[in-house]
């Protein structure tokens, strides 16, 4: 409501992030879990079925964010139309914006890459669940669930030769607890075994442990089982 009051005929989120202005300029890569559908079609809506006005991405972009993970438990909050509206909004962002999380449900090969200072990053994004909502009918795009090992393994194998650093967002765990559960541990280790370099965990809304894991091929993987999110 405050953002609407400030913007008049639009939403202005800048004041909410004013204290962060300039902070992210010091980093080469700024990644963010966008845990609501951002779009220009649906009215703004809160818990439990979220919708965020498109103006939020102007603020986030100006703060320095360029990489956005879109796969989480709220990805299906507005059904097929919500997916379409959100993807259309992100597609209209500047060319240096990278998103991942809504995959072509036939090929699963709309991969996301970013090259910074000569280093190529590959990004994948998955979720443990979508609050019980199934993949909507009438959409060509959707999320990949973390227990779909066959699809995930193929995506990792496809991307691995094309990037120097492969980063996976894993939306999983239990909200409101600092304790890492068995599903998180097992999933993180499995991802490490597939050759992932970095695992960024989201969903619990609190900070959990960071750790180095050794994959099946002797590779070393850094995992942060909960990172900061915006919702």
Q: How does the language model describe each region?
A:
Residues 1-231:
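Acidic, metal/ion-coordinating pockets
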């Amino acid at each position: 409501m405050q953002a609407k009051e400030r913007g008049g005929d639009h939403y202005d989120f800048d004041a909410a992030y004013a204290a962060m202005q300039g902070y992210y300029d010091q980093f080469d890569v700024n990644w963010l879990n966008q845990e609501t559908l951002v779009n220009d079609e649906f009215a703004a809506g809160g818990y439990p079925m979220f919708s965020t006005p498109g103006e939020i991405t102007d603020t986030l972009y100006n703060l320095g964010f360029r990489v956005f993970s879109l796969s989480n438990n709220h990805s299906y909050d507005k059904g097929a139309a919500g997916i379409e509206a959100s993807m259309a909004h992100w597609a209209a962002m500047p060319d240096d914006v990278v998103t991942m999380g809504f995959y072509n449900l036939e090929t699963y090969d709309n991969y996301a890459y970013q090259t910074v200072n000569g280093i190529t990053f590959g990004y994948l994004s998955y979720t443990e669940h979508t609050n019980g909502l199934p993949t909507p009918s009438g959409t060509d795009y959707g999320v990949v669930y973390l227990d779909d090992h066959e699809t995930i393994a193929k995506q990792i194998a496809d991307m691995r030769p094309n990037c120097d650093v492969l980063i996976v967002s894993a939306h999983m765990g239990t909200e409101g607890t600092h304790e890492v559960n068995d599903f998180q541990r097992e999933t993180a280790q499995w991802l490490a075994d597939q050759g992932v370099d970095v695992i960024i965990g989201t969903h619990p809304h609190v900070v959990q442990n960071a750790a180095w894991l050794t994959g099946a091929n002797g590779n070393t993987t850094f995992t942060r089982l909960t990172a900061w999110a915006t919702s």
